[in-house]
């Protein structure tokens, strides 16, 4: 099987990345072909054969440099376009999503579904939740009383 592992960071950074790399290694050891999609970064240790990655938003650059960031963290045209290049080339049987919030956005799910319909490919989508961010922007799942 061909499996596309998707995570915003595709270099060692934290728990989600460790998990993603361990899953990729295990899948390869069992004879599956694995490629990765995420942010463009010089630290990337894995990737895809077409070199299609999303431009990293550097939030440390201040407000002026990131005026469109509030929109890009909800919906990313660039991420949709870049994942389509990988889908067309790799033709995965499974797309396994991990941390996609802020940089990649759920917009990539729309592109995966569009690609599946257009190609009639029976590609499965799997999503592993590593935190609450997609359902609670503050990550903590606190109520108004911070409980």
Can you describe what each PLM-predicted range is?
Residues 21-26, 53-56, 132:
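Metal-centered catalytic cores of metalloenzymes
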Residues 29-94, 141:
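A conserved catalytic-core segment of Leloir-type glycosyltransferases
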Residues 10-11, 41-44, 101-102, 131-134:
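Short, solvent-exposed loop/turn segments at secondary-structure junctions
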Residues 84-104, 123-128:
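Short N-terminal targeting/anchoring amphipathic segment
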Residues 60-66, 128-147:
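Acceptor-binding helix/loop patch of EC 2.4 sugar-transfer enzymes
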Residues 17-18, 45-50, 108-109, 137-142:
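Short aromatic-enriched loop/helix-cap "lid" or pocket-rim segments at secondary-structure transitions
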Residues 1-43, 88-90, 108, 112-123:
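N-terminal subdomain of nucleotide-sugar transferases
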Residues 7, 36-38, 96-99, 129:
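Short beta-strand segments
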């Amino acid at each position: 099987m061909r499996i596309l592992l998707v995570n915003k960071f595709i270099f060692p950074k934290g728990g989600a990345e460790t998990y993603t790399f361990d899953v990729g290694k295990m899948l390869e050891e069992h004879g599956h072909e694995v490629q990765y999609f995420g942010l463009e970064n010089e630290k990337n240790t894995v990737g895809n054969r077409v070199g299609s990655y999303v431009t990293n938003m550097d939030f440390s650059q201040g407000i002026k440099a990131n005026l469109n960031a509030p929109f890009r963290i909800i919906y990313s045209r660039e991420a949709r376009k870049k994942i389509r290049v990988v889908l067309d080339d790799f033709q995965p049987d499974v797309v396994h999503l991990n941390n996609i919030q802020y940089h990649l956005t759920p917009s990539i799910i729309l592109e995966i579904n569009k690609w599946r319909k257009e190609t009639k490919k029976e590609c499965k989508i799997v999503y592993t939740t590593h935190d609450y961010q997609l359902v609670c922007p503050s990550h903590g799942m606190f109520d108004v009383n911070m409980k």
